[in-house]
């Protein structure tokens, strides 16, 4: 509990002297006090209070803090400070996501070492962050570019490698020609690099992957645990990205090839409608089939493949583009019908979907139909979409002469080959032999059973999710702890040899060239094999920086421990994170990777939980004039200018009051100057209090006490529902009520005024800590108000005063009833209609209209019954 000043209240000494709210003076006064007191440290082993872990997504050190940072850290701090007031020990740390391309590119542009550039930016941001005053535990700071951190990235890599979850393979990868490095699928947005916005191409490289697809089912199914605790939009985005589908793997024999080709399909019921096969031109199967083709076919294929490699994935999947392809002059065999079908290579099939080959059913798939029409391939309808898809299965009779099925009469089917529109709706199978008349679900089951019985297929699942490509051809990242030995192959670096330090950048050409600059550091690259002692070379790629952030929440538990990544006992105490705050831009990348790594650590016994973040809050963006802020648009608002002009607390309060936290804030529409005026008004309330700190409040003004205690009762629910703007609005009402009591009511000496001022101060601490701390001192207490328990409301003060509702019948008052001021229109009308006085007055007359003005008036109009 905070201690009282021996000198009594500052306000009493000040008397009626005019005072001025000086935010700069207040900030200068309290920041060094907090630095000395460390009120937010969480290193006391004897602290047995319940715990909360509140974490903001850590920033990237590219320049100073901006308006987006200001919003995120203001909102996260509301939550951290709230839980401290609720009696919790709160872990609220901060660090820097310090590796990565932006720092490396900025350093190259300026001719600097990425280390110096990064650490200078961290120092600048740290100073700005301290000024902004989030309630961070500054003894738990980390930077991911420190060897003391990335040593444990390498440890994590080795743990995945031991379990076969980290592996290296050659494949077609996403390639950013500007940054000259590979990208994970999640880092490609609409065919462009999510960092530099350049078009992404494909390139065949040998790269390192994490086997996240092994966890696809769990990553999808465990989203159910997060329903209601994470934004629905984020959960939907992850579900769609993981993209589980069910169907069958169907084996198609290839004429002239010993091994069949597996084709994944969600619609095995349409097998009778397959008229050709399409393979991805950049797949190994296409290359193999083209290799055995005639020279002119092989040449056409190679020319086509070269063109495809210059096409973005988005363009390849577009339904608007003209379909292109090459006939490979090879044929496959339909496993159900025995029909020979031609094999084409076409760019609308991707090598990493299913098995890189599809069975084309042009009558019932639009892209297949577009391709079939472009190359005059047959179109066979096998689903009658005019037949009901559900209900009783129709009895299928056969023509006694031809043996052909006689289906129930229905509207004539239009030919997709003529209309250009595929029949994608539900219906009944036709032209499908023994499966005619079956609905989609029954046909899928029956066809799959038939394939399985003959060894030509089996039920299967497929995922949109691909393994996480984690190697990068750049300098500023975590070195991969593997050496390559001609005799032994891949050899992991022993844990005792970690960290594998980055070599100095001096002397290395960091300009992007498509290969890692580390390859030129010969003294660093060439080492002895840890297995046989022979010559070996270090792996020269560095890790994707999303590896760094996938587990950083655990490193905060003991960031200075050089013996382990984190202490499992501390993880039991603090983790998982109770409240995570950050932008929706990380809905897939960071959050999905963190969920994956957490499950890996769970499986290996390092943690006892499977989800890293219990509750997630995504804040909106800070805009200017309806657009994202940028120098090029000329609408950039500098945070430092706003802090200088209005003060830290006014900016923080504005961020919380502007609207629901998940909504965007347009800085042109808000008023930090208005926030500053409110803070001055609240601050003067504390200054004007003249009663002593130890007064008994019960004898204070009852009306003000009711306002105060209603605020005390309602605020916890509002904060926990993230309705920070509503809390601020209610706080303004409390300040106004207190001011009114001081100026025209019971006066500044009234005990209820002190109570209201103290509650105002505690609540204001959530949003404006400098002002709140100064108010707390003016009220006669020692710092810090942050550690003061939230007051419990008096239930007797929460009982609403009744109001008198007048009930009129035909303009005459017939009854008066005492009701709640919050009574609804329907409730008040029902109460009036049931009044005995009203019933007597109405008698047998007909009620024509009832006008209700809740909570004070009901007017009933009647007329004689004819």
UniProtKB/Swiss-Prot annotation:
Its EC number is 6.1.1.4. InterPro entries: aa-tRNA-synth_I_CS (IPR001412), aa-tRNA-synth_Ia (IPR002300), Leu-tRNA-ligase (IPR002302), Leu_tRNA-synth_edit (IPR025709), M/V/L/I-tRNA-synth_anticd-bd (IPR013155), Rossmann-like_a/b/a_fold (IPR014729), tRNAsynth_Ia_anticodon-bd (IPR009080), Val/Leu/Ile-tRNA-synth_edit (IPR009008). Residues 404-418 have a biased composition (Low complexity). A motif ('HIGH' region) lies at residues 59-69. It comes from the Bacteria. Keywords: Aminoacyl-tRNA synthetase, ATP-binding, Cytoplasm, Ligase, Nucleotide-binding, Protein biosynthesis. GO terms for molecular function: aminoacyl-tRNA deacylase activity; ATP binding; leucine-tRNA ligase activity. It catalyses: tRNA(Leu) + L-leucine + ATP = L-leucyl-tRNA(Leu) + AMP + diphosphate. PANTHER family: LEUCINE--TRNA LIGASE, MITOCHONDRIAL (PTHR43740:SF2), LEUCYL-TRNA SYNTHETASE (PTHR43740). This is Leucine--tRNA ligase. It comes from Leifsonia xyli subsp. xyli (strain CTCB07).
């Amino acid at each position: 509990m905070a201690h009282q000043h021996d000198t009594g209240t500052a306000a009493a000494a000040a008397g009626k002297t005019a005072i001025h709210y000086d935010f700069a003076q207040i900030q200068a006064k309290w920041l060094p006090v907090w630095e000395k007191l460390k009120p937010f440290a969480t290193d006391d082993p004897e602290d047995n209070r319940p715990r909360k872990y509140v974490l903001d997504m850590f920033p990237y050190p590219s320049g100073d803090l901006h308006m987006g940072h200001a919003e995120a850290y203001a909102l996260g701090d509301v939550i951290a400070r709230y839980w401290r007031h609720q009696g919790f020990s709160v872990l609220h740390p901060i660090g820097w996501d310090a590796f990565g391309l932006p720092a490396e590119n900025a350093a190259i542009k300026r001719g600097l070492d990425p280390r110096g550039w990064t650490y200078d930016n961290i120092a600048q941001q740290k100073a700005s962050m301290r000024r902004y005053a989030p309630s961070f535990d500054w003894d738990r700071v980390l930077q991911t570019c420190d060897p003391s951190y990335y040593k444990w990235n390498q440890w994590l890599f080795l743990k995945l490698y031991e379990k076969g979850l980290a592996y290296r393979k050659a494949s077609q990868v996403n390639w950013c020609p500007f940054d000259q490095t590979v990208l994970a699928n999640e880092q490609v947005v609409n065919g462009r690099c999510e960092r530099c916005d350049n078009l992404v191409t494909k390139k065949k490289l040998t790269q390192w992957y994490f086997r996240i697809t092994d966890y696809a089912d769990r990553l999808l199914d465990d989203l159910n645990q997060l329903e209601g605790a994470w934004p629905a939009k984020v959960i939907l985005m992850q579900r769609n990205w993981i993209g589980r589908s069910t169907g069958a793997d169907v084996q198609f024999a290839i004429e002239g090839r010993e091994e069949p080709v597996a084709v994944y399909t969600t619609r095995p019921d349409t097998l009778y409608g397959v008229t050709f096969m399409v393979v991805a031109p950049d797949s190994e199967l296409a290359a193999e089939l083209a290799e055995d083709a005639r020279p002119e076919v092989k040449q056409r294929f190679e020319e086509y493949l070269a063109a495809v490699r210059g096409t973005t994935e988005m363009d390849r999947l577009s339904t608007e583009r003209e379909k292109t392809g090459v006939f490979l002059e090879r044929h496959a065999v339909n496993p159900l019908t025995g029909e020979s079908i031609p094999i084409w290579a076409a760019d609308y099939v991707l090598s990493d979907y299913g098995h890189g080959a599809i069975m084309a059913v042009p009558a019932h798939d639009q892209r297949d139909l577009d391709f079939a029409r472009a190359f005059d391939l047959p179109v066979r309808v096998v689903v009658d979409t005019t037949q009901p898809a559900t209900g009783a299965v129709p009895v299928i009779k056969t023509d006694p002469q031809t043996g052909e099925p006689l289906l129930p009469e229905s509207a004539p089917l239009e030919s997709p080959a003529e209309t250009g529109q595929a029949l994608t709706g539900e219906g009944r199978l036709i032209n499908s032999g023994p499966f005619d008349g079956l609905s989609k679900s029954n046909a899928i089951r029956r066809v799959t059973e038939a394939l399985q019985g003959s060894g030509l297929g089996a039920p299967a699942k497929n995922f949109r999710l691909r393994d996480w490509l984690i190697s990068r051809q750049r300098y500023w990242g975590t070195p991969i702890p593997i050496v390559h030995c001609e005799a032994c192959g891949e050899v992991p670096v022993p844990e005792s040899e970690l960290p594998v330090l980055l070599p100095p950048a001096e002397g290395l050409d960091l300009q992007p060239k498509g290969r890692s600059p580390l390859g030129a550091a010969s003294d660093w690259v060439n080492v002895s094999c840890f297995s046989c002692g022979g010559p070996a070379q270090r792996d020269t790629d560095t890790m994707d920086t999303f590896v760094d952030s996938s587990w950083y929440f655990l490193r905060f538990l003991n960031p200075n421990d050089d013996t382990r990544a984190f202490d499992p006992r501390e993880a039991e105490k603090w983790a998982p994170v109770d409240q995570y705050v950050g932008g929706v831009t990380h809905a897939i990348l960071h959050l999905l990777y963190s969920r994956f790594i957490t499950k890996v650590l769970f499986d290996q016994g390092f943690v006892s939980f499977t989800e890293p973040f219990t509750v997630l809050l995504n804040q909106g963006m800070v805009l200017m004039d309806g657009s994202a802020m940028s120098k090029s648009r000329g609408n950039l608002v500098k945070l430092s200018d706003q802090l200088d002009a209005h003060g830290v607390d006014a900016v923080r309060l504005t961020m919380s009051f502007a609207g629901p936290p998940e909504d965007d804030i347009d800085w042109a529409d808000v008023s930090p100057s208005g926030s500053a005026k409110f803070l001055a008004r609240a601050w003067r309330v504390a200054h004007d209090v003249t009663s002593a700190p130890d007064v008994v409040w019960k004898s204070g003004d009852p009306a003000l006490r009711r306002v105060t205690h209603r605020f005390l009762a309602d605020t916890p629910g509002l904060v926990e529902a993230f309705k920070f703007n509503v809390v601020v609005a209610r706080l303004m009402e409390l300040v106004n009520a207190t001011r009114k009591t001081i100026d025209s009511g019971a006066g500044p000496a009234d005990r209820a005024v002190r109570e209201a001022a103290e509650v105002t101060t505690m609540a204001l601490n959530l949003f404006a800590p400098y002002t709140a701390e100064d108010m707390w001192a003016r009220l006669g207490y020692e710092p810090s108000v942050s550690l003061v328990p939230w007051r419990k409301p008096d239930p007797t003060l929460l009982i609403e005063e009744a109001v008198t509702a007048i009930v009129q019948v035909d303009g005459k008052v017939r009854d008066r009833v005492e009701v709640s001021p919050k009574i609804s229109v329907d409730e008040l009308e029902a109460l009036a209609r049931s009044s005995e006085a009203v019933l007597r007055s109405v008698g047998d007359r007909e009620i024509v209209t009832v006008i209700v003005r809740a909570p004070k008036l009901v007017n009933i109009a009647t007329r004689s019954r004819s």
